Amino acid sequence: MNELEFVTLHRRHLHQYPELSLHEFETTSYITSFLEDLGVPYDRPLKTGVIAYLEGNSHHTIAFRADIDALPIYEENDIDFKSKNDNVMHACGHDGHTTALMLFVKRCKALYDKSELPHNVVFIFQPAEETGGGANRLIKAGAFDKYPIEAVFGFHVNPFEKEGKIVIRDEEITASATEYRFFLKGLSSHVADKEQGHSCGEGLQHVLSQIGQIQQFHLNGLKRNIIHMGHFEAGEAINTVPSHGYLEGTIRTYDTEDLAIVKHQMHKIAKSVQLLFNVECEVKFEEGYPPTMNHPQLRQAVENAIKGANLEIVEKKLPFLFGEDFSFYGQQLAPSYFVFVGTQNNEKGFVTGLHTAHLNFDEKILIDVVNYYEHLLRNYKEV
């Protein structure tokens, strides 16, 4: 079996059997069976996910990560390897990420068997990137305590960049993701006696209008930020004053000062609702993933590896506004570098975005990724 056949076989199997965050049991079994067949040792520090390891010819230890979970999306692709799990799909390309790392394990094991593996390698098949913060869970569980990891590398497919191109950026490359929720409690009454009630409906209207003002009047317009309202509700009947209200959304920013400003303004909005509409109003925040920071000291190694793999470098001027839990590795484990690999192919119709029901790509790009990884490994110099 050649490498294209390898990545096609494994990626399409994984694509047919996607599993949601923290439920990647069959995916984990598939990976461990593959590792056992190769004779590669591994650990399972969590219920799902796998950490594999090969010892090389130096004291340097480098880690490579792939996320393995899928999304609650019904697949609409008309393909013979369409998802067989109802309303679950690899709509973010993690089937490709996993397959690429499997091929990289295979290459590294071949080098190991010939005593030619240049450095120690940790292979991270990580669960729960989409929800659950699998990277942070692995770190907190001590999964890497026995490995003196010096650098962590990872990638994500990018359907908005053409095949053969890799997008890089020093410092922030993805945004932080913070969820916010407004809770309103008022007093219900019949609509004919609405003056007897305290309307959460009007309170919600105020929250909505004021959230829209934050970005316009309180944040630097030259920076990229998103304050998105995703869901709201109030009341239960058409002829009553709503006694409760709820609104939730997400904040995407790569600047901690901007995030602090947004939170401060939202607290002010909650207080103003209480004063203006005589309803209780509280806002709560759930911290998601911090910005993914690419460490500049790894830049030259990444550039050299991309060029060595005969791929094209695309310099990203501004960070992506995705959230990505790869950020925890750079924040808590070791210097890290995360890139985006182009998968766009207009002739084959591979043009739809991430988290859509039609995401697809040509498996050959996974070999490009592994070539890039191998160049990183062979030419790695201590940070």
From Swiss-Prot:
Q: Name one GO molecular function term.
A: hydrolase activity
Which top-level group of life is the source organism from? Bacteria
Q: Known Pfam families for this protein?
A: M20_dimer (PF07687), Peptidase_M20 (PF01546)
What EC number(s) would the UniProt record show? 3.-.-.-
Under InterPro entries, the record lists: Amidohydrolase (IPR017439), Bact_exopeptidase_dim_dom (IPR036264), Peptidase_M20 (IPR002933), Peptidase_M20_dimer (IPR011650)
Keywords of the record: Hydrolase
Keyword Transport among UniProt keywords: no
Query: Is Hydrolase given among the entry's keywords?
Result: yes
EC supergroup of this enzyme: hydrolase
Stored PANTHER family = METALLOPEPTIDASE, PUTATIVE (AFU_ORTHOLOGUE AFUA_6G09600)-RELATED, PEPTIDASE M20 FAMILY MEMBER
Q: Which family does it belong to?
A: Belongs to the peptidase M20 family.
Q: What is this protein called?
A: Uncharacterized hydrolase SE_1078
